[in-house]
Amino acid sequence: MKMPKNNVYTVSQLNGEVRQLLEGELGRVWLNAEISNFSSPSSGHWYLTLKDHFAQIRCAMFKGKNRTVTFRPANGQQVLVKGSISVYEPRGDYQLIIESMLPAGDGMLAQQYEALKMKLAAEGLFATDTKRPLPTNINKIGVITSATGAALKDVLHVLARRDPSIEVVVYPTQVQGDNAAKLICRAIELANARQEVDVLLLTRGGGSLEDLWCFNSEDLAHCIYNSALPVVSAVGHEVDTSISDYVADVRAPTPSAGAELLSKDADDKAHKLIAGLSRLKQSWQHYQLKTVQKATALENRLQRQDPKRRLEQFEQSFDEMQLRLNAALNSRIHKLALKQQNLSHRLSQQSPEHRLTLEAKRLDYLTTRLNEGIKDKLHDVELSLKNSAHQLQTVSPLATLSRGYSITQDESGKVLLNAKDAKTGDLLTTRLLEGELRSKVV
């Protein structure tokens, strides 16, 4: 037998070539089949065989992927899986690496979901550069959900706890069923027409794939994309991901998480305000210290340039010169007299009265500027303190009472949130803006 000169493979090289060909040519595939030989070792990976009446294929689903499966696979169960063909090179076996798994009953919906997801992604509805940023200061939130659902209660509870000053406008709508997507679109359009809120929170609680199917509507996706108001999608539980989550500007895993995302903790606001006032006080004290230091430095400079002191120095020098003249020889008297005349002329050019007048005017000007600067700074600080006091007032519980609300407590001081919390015979105290009422449950 004649040996070929080229294309001689080792077994590992051949298996590697086959793996690259299969993975490159087939890519991802969908498979509808029955489970057999299912095993789940301590590593957390799943190993199984998928089969029909005529053939079978070995499969693996690693733990990073099988964590997203919402049911426990069992032998004999019919499933729909998505995966990619690969080769396990040590044995030369070709296998399917599973990425997602659904019961066969959900298969049609899953295929529709993937097809719509790919279509909308190609149209650019998921692009990050088109997403609207959330407002920095949110004062009013529009909630699009069922008026009787648990999601609305969760949202209101979180907002009341974190920031009671945020107003909520509910746009009630059906969030399940054939007409739900159309009704949700109407709610979004109504909110955009009214322009009465800063942001929209589209939300509902968890459910099956069929329950959440309205949030996978193509019409709803375009409605969210075209909204002028920013939209936060908080649909289902953390493991649920709908088309609305991809299109929305921000996705929150649950209704409560959506409410927390859109609210700032009231205690944090108060702490930041107090910290701001403290920094303002320190800045004012620093400014006062600097002003006093500058005034002291100016005063020292003026003292060093005092005309009276300079005149005394000149007089002392003149006396010394007179003593020297008197002690000099007669032959130098004429010369010294001329020198004295020259010195007298120089002194007349440096009149102390003229310089004293200039320095006095300068001192008056600096004093006036210093007083005006202090008055202006005090005025600015007073305005800032008034604004800070107004902000504290808006988050005060007393502000809530001033709008007509009241707080009811039992004998232990616990605040009652539900009428069911009060029992017959309990003594209750209702606090109003001014005073309180005491009552007994009958």
Curated annotation (Swiss-Prot):
One GO biological process term: DNA catabolic process
Compartments it resides in: Cytoplasm
Enzyme Commission number: 3.1.11.6
GO CC terms in record: cytoplasm; exodeoxyribonuclease VII complex
Entry keyword set: Cytoplasm, Exonuclease, Hydrolase, Nuclease
A GO term, aspect molecular function: nucleic acid binding
EC class name: hydrolase
Reactions this protein catalyses: Exonucleolytic cleavage in either 5'- to 3'- or 3'- to 5'-direction to yield nucleoside 5'-phosphates
Coiled-coil ranges from the UniProt annotation: none
One Pfam family, short name: tRNA_anti_2
UniProt-listed HAMAP family: Exonuc_7_L
Main function: Bidirectionally degrades single-stranded DNA into large acid-insoluble oligonucleotides, which are then degraded further into small acid-soluble oligonucleotides.
Family: Belongs to the XseA family.
Quaternary state and interactors: Heterooligomer composed of large and small subunits.
Designated name of the protein: Exodeoxyribonuclease 7 large subunit
Source species: Shewanella woodyi (strain ATCC 51908 / MS32)
